[in-house]
Amino acid sequence: MNLTTQKRLAADILKVGVNRIWIDPERIDEVSRAITRDGVKQLIKDGAIKAKPKKGISSYRSKKIAQQKKKGRRRGPGSIKGAKGARRPKKDEWMTTIRALRKDLKEMRDNREINKSTYRKLYKMAKGGAFKSKSYMKTYARDHDMLR
């Protein structure tokens, strides 16, 4: 049974594409007899003809990728785009380092490992970028007899 006319009319009435028209398989004879717009409208009202929902974009793949990233996957060298300084700016690295150094210096001063003048000297050196880590700073202080 050819239902192209009915599908075309229904698509026009429902303002959807022809491929989104669904016809009840149990009422095909009834639908085939409807050859006017009014007949098709009546069938739509009765529920013999309906518009299928839009397909949309599946979120399965994006969810799967997000799950993998949560587990720490997809972080290999092939996934890295941008320079080293773009992924973690130099300023951020500097801030992390200097905060650690200053915190360590305060602890050393409060625990009386160093005196105020030594604290100030090491503080200024840290600010100038003389130490790249806490261990370097402690080694420097030990080697130059700055510790009490």
Curated annotation (Swiss-Prot):
The keyword Hydrolase does not apply. The keyword RNA-binding applies. It comes from the Archaea. Pfam families: Ribosomal_L19e (PF01280), Ribosomal_L19e_C (PF25476). InterPro entries: 60S_ribosomal_eL19_sf, Ribosomal_eL19, Ribosomal_eL19_arc, Ribosomal_eL19_CS, Ribosomal_eL19_dom, Ribosomal_eL19_dom1. GO terms for cellular component: cytosolic large ribosomal subunit. GO terms for molecular function: large ribosomal subunit rRNA binding; structural constituent of ribosome. Transmembrane segments: none annotated. Gene3D superfamilies: 1.10.1200.240, 1.10.1650.10. GO terms for biological process: translation. Keywords: Ribonucleoprotein, Ribosomal protein, RNA-binding, rRNA-binding. Binds to the 23S rRNA. Belongs to the eukaryotic ribosomal protein eL19 family. NCBIfam families: PRK08570.1. This is Large ribosomal subunit protein eL19.
